[in-house]
Amino acid sequence: MQWTAASCDQHDQHDPPAVNRNSIEQRTPANNCEVDPMDATGSTKHPHLPKQREADRPVSGSGGGSSSLTLSGAVTTSMEVTVSTTTTTTIIESSSSTNTTLEKNSPSPAGGSCSSGSGSLSPAYLQHHLQHHGSPLHHLQVHHHTAPPSPLAAVRSAQMGSSVANGAGPAAACLAVCCSPGSSHHHLGHVGHLATGHPLPHQLPHQLPHPSLYPLMAAAQLGYAGSSGPSSLVNSPALGRRKRYTSNSSNCSSQFNNNYAGLDVDSLDDMLRKLTELEQRVIEAEERAEEAEDKVRAMEQRLSEWPKPPPQQAQHPHSHSHPHQPIPSHPQEQQAKNHCSPSHQASGGATAGAAGSGLPPTQETEKTITSLEIQVEEQRQLRLHDARQIEAKAAKIKEWVNNKLRDLEEQNQLLREQNVKCNQQLELLKNHIANQSQRHSIVGPVRNSLSLDVQDFTGSGSNPEHRRRSESLDPQEIIGRPLTSSYPHHQHRRNLSMEPQELERNLVAAVDGLTLAPLSSISNKAPGGVPTESGVVTRPDSSDTDTAHDYAEIYTPSCEKLPAWMKNNPALMASGGNSSTTTTTTSELGVPRPPTPPLHRFPSWEAKIYQVANDGLAGAGTGTSTAESTASQEPDIQDGMGTNLSNGRRHGHGHGSGTGIGTGDGHGTLGSTPGTPLPPSRQQQTASGGFCDISVPVYATVKGRASQIRSMPFTGDSSDDSSDGEDHAVMLTHHSHNSSSTDNTETSTSGSASSPSKSLKTSSSLSPAKRSGSESPKNAKARVHIQSRTSTTPSSRINQHLQPSQHQHHTLSNQNHGHQLGAYTVTPSSGQLSLPRYHANALQPGSLPSPLQHMRGTVISDLSFESGLSDDYALPPDAVSESTCMDASMPSLLMRQSYVDSPSKKIESLEKMGHLAKLGGKLKTWRKRWFVLKNGSLNYWKSQHDVQRKPQGQIQLDEVCRINRAEGASTFEIDTGKKVYYLTADSHATMDDWIRVLQNVQRRNATKLLLSRDDQKPTVQGWVTKVKNGHPKKCWCVLLGKMFLYFKAPAETNPLGQINMRDARVEEVEHVSDSDSEEREDAAQDQARLTVAIYPAHQGPTYLILSGKPERDNWLYHLTVVSGGGPSAGTQYEQLVQKLMETDGDPNCVLWRHPILLHTKDTITAPLSSMHTETMQPEAIKLFKSIQLFMSVAVNQPGIDYHVVLAQNALQHALDMPELQTEMICILIKQTSRHLGQKLSVGVQVNKKLGKQTRQLLLCATQSLFTCDTQQAGHAQANGSSPTSIQAPSATPIIDCKSNPPVYSFVQGWQLLALAVSLFVPRSSRLLWYLKLHLSRNADTKTETGKYAAYCERALERTLKNGGRETKPSRMEVLSILLKNPYHHSLPHAIPVHMMNSTYQVVSFDGSTTIEEFQATLAHELGTRDATNGFCLFSDDPIEKDLEHYLEPLAKLCDVISKWETALREKGSGKFENSRVIQLSYKNRLYWKHTIKCETDKERLLLCYQTNSQIVQGRFPLSRELALELASLMSQIDMGDYSLEKSRDVGVGLKGLDKFYPYRYRDALGAEQLKDVQELLVSKWMLLKGRSTLDCVRIYLTCCRKWPYFGACLFQAKPRQSPESNTASGATPVAWLAVAEDALNVLELSTMAPVARYPYSSVMTFGGCQDDFMLVVSHDDGGGGEQKLLFAMSKPKILEITLLIADYMNALGHTVPGTPQMNSLTRNGSHRSLRTSQRPNLGGGSAVATGFSTNATTTAHNTLNSHATHTLNSNHSHTLSSSHHAGGGSQPGTLSSGHHQHHHIQQHHQPDILKSTPDHQRIK
């Protein structure tokens, strides 16, 4: 925005001054030529530049007409008037600078005063201006006045000069100018505008100075002379510059005004105001800087002219300055002012005196002048330096401001475009509403989805910006809520990170109150392919293409909002019947166009393959791949108006003879082909339940994260419904059905009888179901109670079908309130009744209109009204807003006082009340309830006001009740045995309070029950004085089992307290207690009393004061028996271990030779460790015998299975009974401890220097202490050993004692110990210490047993790190330990892992290796990414051939193998099948679109083979031609170039067809056709000769990724429907459930066309429900409510799809390393992992952190759909750009591993696992 006058002197070109960074005005960086204003002395006024030399200044009159002036918008220094100047320009301008009065006491001849800046105007001038020039017409005439210069200008100049000289002032001169004929003084006003920095719209042409500005120049000169003195009029060096300045100003203003009248001033007001403010700040800053410069320059000039001082300079230069001087802008200026002013004044006074007396200057004066000159020179240099710095800063600021203004201008332009588009949309919307309101006929049936592929038709069709995606908007959304504007980039509204809120509010306000009817169905398409409706959407050849675009953005219905897709989709109905349904085809459901062609050129052969992929993939292009034969085989579907819409399916051209998807060449649909078997029956599911009991968990969504709320499916019984008879007015008509209603003859036995309580394995976080949106339920759309729980009459159940075409308006009268409900509609896609927002609180069932009686099979979702007093639906804990209720921020506010007023004694609170959210209802939604805990029971009401009524439910807290809390969520569960209540608090603090009080009540209730039982007799009881913390109290004390209880009285059932004696220590003390004032009731107690002290583990001591010795002895004896503390506690074996601990494991201690600690051949008579029950003692003795039997018989190679079974049974016995685990470790330690003997001497000699205590210790030992020969260490004292030590001299050789068994017995004992320490460790810390000490004492690399001991040390550390095991060791594990010493290998076991390309990799592991660790090792050896590639491990099923099981990351691999072997034996033939072992495979499970560029070559190769497996099995929609192209690529990848040797093999082509061609195409071919296809495959294969494997892999994946659902894991499922909604045939067809990374999609079985889509953000609950898969979704589009969907699937598939959805949801909130950040839905750390003490996190694994492979089920073996491909579907509009990856950067040879290894591994050719453990396989 520049404008230029005639020309400008080059000496005046300077950079603009610095401006504020916050300014937003725009300036032009180039050619900033500005004129600097002059001060009284003619110096430049630029604050940031050095003073201009006198020689460089222009002389008077030098500013001719050739000077040019350029203004750059913001900085207009040249148009300003500084403090000491007054021009006509600034007199007229009235808004920019401050009002400053100059020279109040001016001695000018004019005698008047004038104002600087623009603050004060002459009233006479203003009146004259308004009277004569007020009309806009005059403005227009003056602005265009371009008269040439007139001779009258000189006359006016003379008149104005005389008027100023006579004292009239500049205002009179201005009036003279205004009144002169032909003058255009309005230029002056606009010059004032320019002085404020107002920008001009565009560059103006060059013009001569206007004649009216010549007198203005003269007036400016006269005004300046009047203010500065008469001499300055003639001699001022600034006169010429001031003329040029004034002329340039007038010229610029003339150009501006000639073009300014044509602009819209209102549109620029905003920008002008901002620029004015910025200019004001600039002017103020410059004024301050110029004030300081003026003083310095004036001083400098006076000093330079000192020898010839004029008479005028005797006056002080500062006499006329403004009284209020601004502070200089720099410290140097202030310093110069302060430093120079006094000296200057002194020298000035002396000079004046000398001049008056006529004497010459003295020497002192010369010195003063010299010093002043030096100081002035220093100040000049400082100013120069500062000017350079300021100039550099100003340049940077200028550049930043320019860039900022440029960006803002671009944003403004974009907003203007959006505004235009929104206005067009609004007009279109109004027109459409007007057209709809004019129609009074019945609207046709609403289409479930409408796809509008509209282009701009401007020749840039390939540009993705011009391609409109198939947006979707449900008619329910249009009806039920105000419309919002579409984002101009045509993205789906769920993908928007920010919406233009202001535009949205404008659009809502514009259409507020308007009701929009649903769209009419479109019966046919226009010739151009664009659907037409009522003339609103035009054809492509129409000129109004923008209208079509806007209409497509607003009125595209959604397949995403189709909760009743199974009712409205004809492809999923067995027969159409009389129901009015519409068709949903591939093209109509928004299948996008092919991706944009790449920027680089492909080779012709590669481009041809991509073209085939575009045409041959169903859904990859515009839908042309669906063959006509497919459409011809399907029945014609009639819509509601009777129009045949089946021709909409015949919109493509075929390739070859019938390239339809799933046609099978006339042999039925895809579901009947051999490649896609239907789901097995329920009996087959039972038989193929896998090698573990399958229990499908249930998940709820909280903050975008899937949290497990149940470890087993919902059974539909009252036991898993925690509603307790609450109002069930909201029900789904098809929900509460039994599996017998559809499959009467089917049974299910697997996984349905397990306990409802969750085990430690699956105790993941419990969370409430997420409600979409953050608005309060009271602000949600009002719902109507349509159906009550008790009423079952047809009038109360809305199960009739309302015709979708009948969008009728009915009035529902509310009998209670007497007003009417507005118009309602029933959307056919969801079947939900839509009502106006605030109309009624209830709706009588009998008042429903007749059309609702025709709703058949329609899901009536949550339609209940929210009354003002009822807070039925609670806010989820994550949606608590700032207006949270008080109990959320103060969790203990309503809690009863927990402590009594006593300062020392605390009483636990047993009562509490407050709000909790409870999971209840058939939809399992969270409802807010008022809970009150009192008298040992938990009651709840609907609200706090209902406390006086009967409670809705009651929870008894007895001994069976279990209270479990969740990790990471404020949710806990109360399991009463019959029901499980899921409760959610508002915060973690509130939850902790509730759990603490509930546990206190439960503990108290359990004590009551314990005392009331007849079989629980107290061991001892009586009155005892208890002293605690110095406070005595007489209590009734009872010793019950190991619990010491004390009560107020014998009849009390609530104890005052309790002490667990298990870890307490009991001692007798001599009447010493910490009591300060013991109670004495009578004189008899004055005698000495006896005291027993109890020292609990983590508490202070408690003293019991007893009156007599017999009573004291009785209590002391019984308390000591039940206590667990002290050296004498426990068995004799444990006491010896305790004594060894006291000696710190001294190897010379005599206790090591105690026979109880050493091996024995006899059977023990009592357990070695403490048993809590007597029933476990016989089990311990049996365990000892089995171990003794294992060790006594030598291992024989032919009969090795004898030892395998013995070891497995003993270890399983210990796993089943945890108390036996410590016992087994003790037995193995004892049986592997040798008796040591010497050659010499018999008997025992004790050193004479032994002390008394040592002799007593030896004498107190058992008589059999020394049963083996020993010898005294006579040199013990001389060798520096302890005098109490008894040791054998090291020089004497040690031989085996006679009590030792054969050597093999010890070896086998160590082998069994090596197996045991990998399964469990002792629970007692004392015995764990002893085990570690035993291993370290026996570890020796030179002996066989020493090597086993060294391995046991490593295995023990691994078990302590990763936790224990679940099942017995497998046969493979036992054989690996028995047949070779594990010491030689850090990982003693190994197993092959099979890849999809028929290769395998042998990986080593140990007994504690988890699947996660094993997979990390495998990925390292294969060269793939670790944990981020989505690949997981799967195992085959021992029974079913095609069933595979997903292995959880935290499961132990040895447990997996053991369970597999157990299932093979138990569910198979029952015999040992030693020839079969488990087969592990490595496949992709989770596919991420954003990690494509991070894939390694090995991953892409494996993904190619996995995708090919899906294609061959018919799980990929492609044409015959594309199938041949992909088969040829796979042949090149798998077998290399087609050479002459291969051509001799006739079956090589047939082999390629068998491996890479779809079954459904190959099986229907005859012999001749098969030969032709084989030749065609060979010919395409030959064309790929010389192509590298990397190129073929890249092309193959690029072609396959063009399918929008590439990567979606496919599951076949049968939708469940209510009996009323079943079709005439009573059957519902099977569909595909495609699980992608962002949504669950429903596809047709035959065509794989999309039917419905449920994003994870709308999923509330999912998992098992009886024998079906349940999915509960919410509708946040204004339809309100939730919907429950059921799908019949096999149990393994239900488990797999549940875990897969949970893993995808939990991974959305994480960032994959090395990949871009996804939309974060959850907080950091969201992962479906185990958080139990038995399963600590592994330090080396990263899968737990990234969330790709997670654990969420009860069992360690989860099933997987063995035919599923795991890829991605991330865009809502199903567009997928083609990705091409260069093969560079990878290591050569990584893809060729499949060619150098064995390709075909049959089951009977499995590698020998026991021999495949080379030493080079290790952990790196």
UniProtKB/Swiss-Prot annotation:
Biased composition (Polar residues): 20-31, 453-463, 787-818, 1714-1724
PANTHER family per the UniProt record, alphabetical: MAX-1A (PTHR22903:SF8), PLEKHH PROTEIN (PTHR22903)
UniProtKB keywords: Coiled coil, Phosphoprotein, Repeat
A Pfam entry, by short name: MyTH4
Biological processes per GO annotation: animal organ morphogenesis; neuron differentiation
Organism in which the protein naturally occurs: Drosophila melanogaster
Top-level taxonomic group: Eukaryota
Modified residues (Phosphoserine): S542, S543, S1073, S1075, S1077
Coiled-coil portions: 265-308, 362-438
Classification via Gene3D superfamilies: 1.20.80.10, MyTH4 domain, Phosphatidylinositol 3-kinase Catalytic Subunit, Chain A, domain 1, Pleckstrin-homology domain (PH domain)/Phosphotyrosine-binding domain (PTB)
Biased composition (Basic residues): 129-146
GO-annotated cellular components: cell periphery; cytoskeleton
Domain PH: 909-1003, 1017-1124
UniProt feature, compositional bias: Gly residues: 655-669
Record's protein name: Uncharacterized protein CG43867
Region (Disordered): 1-73, 86-158, 226-260, 286-366, 453-497, 519-548, 577-597, 619-689, 735-830, 1713-1748, 1764-1820
Limits of the MyTH4 domain: 1159-1378
Domain FERM residue range list: 1389-1712
Annotated Low complexity bias: 86-128, 247-259, 346-358, 623-632, 738-769, 1764-1781
